[in-house]
């Protein structure tokens, strides 16, 4: 049986930084209001770079670290809710940019759970024995999704990309997983309603900005997601004490505080970087993983047992436990 492992990690964010003080100049808010409620102090916002541009930079970093070219890749899976276009896919643009001419490429849409869903999918491709190497990237330009006059959402999000190189391995690294969706609660977090625009339809143009019922999403995270994480750990071959780090979607620092207590782990095992980047949706977990490797917290030598968990629109939530 074939197994998969994460062999390289990388991230990339736009150069421009927008602080809470900057936002206070264009909307009715201030640093204390934002940071005390979310933990966010700044975010990176693209001036000219598209979602595929950010993802391409990550792909180039991953290949450079591994010493490979695009021609050696079998697939590219790109998780995003802010694609350059619906067609062609953002992944196809990345494939062309890096010369990965034999790789199949597609986008995956699962909001802030997107990277976890994409990584789970990629692991199955390699486990089939038919594929050896692939890129899994989360990339977002959420600055184009928010209504910049709405302080309830605009202050939360940022742009960025992160990803991993997944390769075949002789040892098992993916230990447990749980992927979930609940479409009955889909309206509490929405973006990109396109509506019907034909001359034969009776539908008016829809509001396409990102909309969120913050309280409902907060409660969902600390109730449903925390319960799912605990269940995934219970059904895995490890104990909660075996986990070195839990890398959770970076939505809100208060969510992480409550999740740590619910799961029963030390808060220090839940690294956070939303203060620097805000909520980057599908990019948040791989950016955090890349930073943990850069900081020496995760040596990327197979010695650490790490839990990844994303949660967001759909509603969707997913957890992976793996050795890295």
Swiss-Prot record:
Region listing for ACP-binding, in residue ranges: 250-254
SUPFAM superfamilies to which the protein is assigned, alphabetical: Thiolase-like (SSF53901)
Gene: fabH
GO BP field: fatty acid biosynthetic process
Known partners and oligomeric status: Homodimer.
GO molecular-function term, one example from the UniProt record: 3-oxoacyl-[acyl-carrier-protein] synthase activity
Protein's job: Catalyzes the condensation reaction of fatty acid synthesis by the addition to an acyl acceptor of two carbons from malonyl-ACP. Catalyzes the first condensation reaction which initiates fatty acid synthesis and may therefore play a role in governing the total rate of fatty acid production. Possesses both acetoacetyl-ACP synthase and acetyl transacylase activities. Its substrate specificity determines the biosynthesis of branched-chain and/or straight-chain of fatty acids.
Family per similarity comment: Belongs to the thiolase-like superfamily. FabH family.
First-tier enzyme category under EC: transferase
Catalytic activities: malonyl-[ACP] + acetyl-CoA + H(+) = 3-oxobutanoyl-[ACP] + CO2 + CoA
InterPro entries: ACP_syn_III_C, ACP_syn_III_N, FabH, Thiolase-like
Protein name stated in the entry: Beta-ketoacyl-[acyl-carrier-protein] synthase III
GO CC annotations on file: cytoplasm
One Pfam family recorded for the sequence: ACP_syn_III_C
Active site: 112, 249, 279
Record-linked CDD domains: KAS_III
Nucleotide-binding as UniProt keyword: no
Organism: Streptococcus pneumoniae (strain P1031)
Keyword flag Amino-acid biosynthesis: no
EC number: 2.3.1.180
Gene3D superfamilies from the UniProt entry: 3.40.47.10
Written domain comment of the UniProt record: The last Arg residue of the ACP-binding site is essential for the weak association between ACP/AcpP and FabH.
Pathway: Lipid metabolism; fatty acid biosynthesis
Coiled coil: none
């Amino acid at each position: 049986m074939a197994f998969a492992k994460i062999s390289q990690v990388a991230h990339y964010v736009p150069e421009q930084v927008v602080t809470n003080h900057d936002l206070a100049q264009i909307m009715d808010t201030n640093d204390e209001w934002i940071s005390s409620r979310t933990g966010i102090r700044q975010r990176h916002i693209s001036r000219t770079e598209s979602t595929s541009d950010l993802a391409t930079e990550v792909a180039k970093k991953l290949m450079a670290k591994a010493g490979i070219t695009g021609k050696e890749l079998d697939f590219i899976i790109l998780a995003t809710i802010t694609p350059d276009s619906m067609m062609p896919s953002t992944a196809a643009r990345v494939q062309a940019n890096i010369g990965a001419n034999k790789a199949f490429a597609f986008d995956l849409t699962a909001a802030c759970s997107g990277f976890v869903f994409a990584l789970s999918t990629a692991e199955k491709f390699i486990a089939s024995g038919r594929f050896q190497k692939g890129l899994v990237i989360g990339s977002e330009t959420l600055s184009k999704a928010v209504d910049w006059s709405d302080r309830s959402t605009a202050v939360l999000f940022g742009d960025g990309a992160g990803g991993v190189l997944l390769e075949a391995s002789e040892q098992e690294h993916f230990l447990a997983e749980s992927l979930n969706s609940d479409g009955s609660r889909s309206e509490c977090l929405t973006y990109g309603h396109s509506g019907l625009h034909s001359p034969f339809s009776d539908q008016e143009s829809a509001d396409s900005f990102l909309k969120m019922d913050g309280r409902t999403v907060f409660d969902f995270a600390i109730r449903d997601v925390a319960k799912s994480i605990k269940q995934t750990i219970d059904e895995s071959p490890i104990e909660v004490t075996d986990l070195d780090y839990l890398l959770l979607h970076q939505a809100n620092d208060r969510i992480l505080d409550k999740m740590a207590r619910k799961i029963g782990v030390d808060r220090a095992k839940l690294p956070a970087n939303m203060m620097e980047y805000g909520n980057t949706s599908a990019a948040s977990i791989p950016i955090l993983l890349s930073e943990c490797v850069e900081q020496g917290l995760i040596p990327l030598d197979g010695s650490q047992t790490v839990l990844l968990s994303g949660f967001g629109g759909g509603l969707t939530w997913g957890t992976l436990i793996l050795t890295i």
